[in-house]
């Protein structure tokens, strides 16, 4: 019954919202059965303006041939923040991402080719002007609606890396106005162009020497110097990959992987029906918090959250802490026992897994002190 489930969840979500730090975020795992009800409930408790995303986790890696109807391969992760405007951390760079960065000019760092321009010329009219091509002498303007990526003094510094440039006023108000999308009478006046200080023969000879030498300036020219202008984006200037709302099993694990992990910890015994893979929680930790974050899992289950926290701390030397809450009778025999074995290490021989280190405390909630407004005689 949906109403019974909501009556169980509502007060818990209200409490969790209060417990969140001001920069905190909550991830709630849910299947299709209660997704719609949970979304409306969370909109009420957290506020629809604090909704961050509905992430689809591909929890299975194979489809049964005898499956009926539309096969359900994903589970949802509803994400809400304590305050509006929360932004996730970037994901670590991958080898595939790094492979796009090359070093054809023997520069200090690998780089990839990027646009030399940026949008919104109308509000950056001082950055709309001509740059004279050092190889051909032709004038290069930003395309319509765009401006040069950096301020003019920075562009001058980069272009001086090819040959000597100077600022010169041109009669090009009509062309600049067209680029900015304004009337010629309204375009900013007095904006100078970056022009070659020497005759084209000397300038192109200087530029050719730089081209052959290597380590070209930040703004370079394609087609062996004869083509258009482009910008280098160095590998160390890109932080990482923004997370998306689809997480494949190859990136964060699947239910079969989670079950195998538990069996390895408990010497082949299947101790839990619906575990989550540690890699799934590790992905959440990567985008949700920093290395000293406090993580609360109020439905701890098999203890995957603690496992993921311990893995992350071992990997990056972080100081994350966890609080697990579990009401079922396996809290001691499975949840806490798993945490202990992960800390100490488990398995034997070639299947041995080194312990993560760390420690934790286990507390058993006793009888309440009060029953209604009266003292509980069982603990008096």
Question: What role is predicted for each listed range?
Answer:
Residues 2, 6, 33-37, 274-350:
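Conserved S-adenosyl-L-methionine
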Residues 61-66, 320-327, 374:
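Short beta-alpha connecting loops at secondary-structure transitions
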Residues 82, 249, 327, 365-367:
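Residues immediately flanking
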Residues 59-65, 329, 364-370:
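Short, conserved secondary-structure transition motifs
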Residues 95-96, 172-179, 301-302, 356-365:
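A glycine-rich phosphate-binding loop feature that marks nucleotide/adenosyl-phosphate handling sites
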Residues 1-294:
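Class I S-adenosyl-L-methionine
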Residues 339-380:
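SAM-dependent methyltransferase catalytic region
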Residues 23-26, 51-53, 293-296, 318-323, ...:
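Residue-level recognition of the N-termini of beta-strands and the immediately preceding loop/turn
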């Amino acid at each position: 019954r949906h109403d019974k489930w909501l009556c169980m969840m509502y007060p818990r979500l209200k409490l969790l919202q209060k417990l969140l730090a001001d920069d905190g975020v909550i991830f709630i795992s849910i299947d299709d059965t209660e997704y719609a009800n949970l979304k409306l409930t969370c909109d009420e408790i957290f506020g629809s303006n604090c909704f961050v995303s509905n992430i689809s986790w591909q929890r299975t890696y194979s489809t049964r041939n005898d499956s009926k109807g539309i096969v359900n391969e994903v589970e949802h992760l509803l994400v809400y923040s304590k305050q509006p405007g929360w932004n996730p951390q970037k994901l670590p760079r991958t080898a595939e991402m790094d492979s796009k960065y090359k070093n054809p000019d023997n520069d200090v760092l690998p780089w990839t080719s990027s646009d030399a321009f940026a949008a919104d010329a109308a509000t950056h009219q001082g950055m709309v002007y001509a740059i004279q091509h050092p190889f051909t002498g032709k004038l290069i303007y930003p395309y319509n609606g765009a401006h040069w990526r950096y301020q003019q003094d920075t562009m001058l510094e980069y272009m001086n890396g090819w040959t000597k440039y100077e600022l010169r006023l041109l009669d090009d108000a009509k062309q600049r106005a067209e680029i900015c999308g304004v009337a010629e009478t309204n375009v900013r006046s007095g904006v100078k162009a970056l022009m070659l200080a020497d005759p084209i023969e000397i300038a192109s000879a200087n530029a050719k020497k730089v081209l052959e030498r290597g380590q070209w300036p930040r703004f370079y020219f394609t087609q062996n110097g004869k083509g258009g202008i482009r910008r280098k984006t160095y590998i160390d200037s890109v932080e990482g990959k923004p997370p998306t709302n689809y997480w494949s099993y190859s990136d964060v694990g699947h239910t079969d992987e989670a079950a195998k992990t538990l069996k390895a910890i408990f010497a082949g015994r299947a101790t839990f029906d619906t575990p989550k893979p540690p890699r799934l929680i590790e992905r959440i930790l990567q985008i949700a918090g920093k290395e000293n974050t406090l993580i609360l899992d109020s439905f701890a289950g098999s203890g995957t959250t603690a496992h993921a926290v311990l893995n992350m701390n071992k990997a990056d030397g972080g100081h994350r802490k966890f609080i697990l809450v579990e009401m079922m009778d396996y809290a001691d025999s499975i949840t806490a026992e798993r945490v202990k074995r992960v800390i100490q290490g488990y398995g034997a021989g070639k299947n041995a897994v080194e312990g993560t280190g760390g420690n934790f405390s286990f507390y058993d909630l006793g009888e309440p002190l009060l029953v209604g407004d009266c003292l509980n005689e069982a603990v008096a």
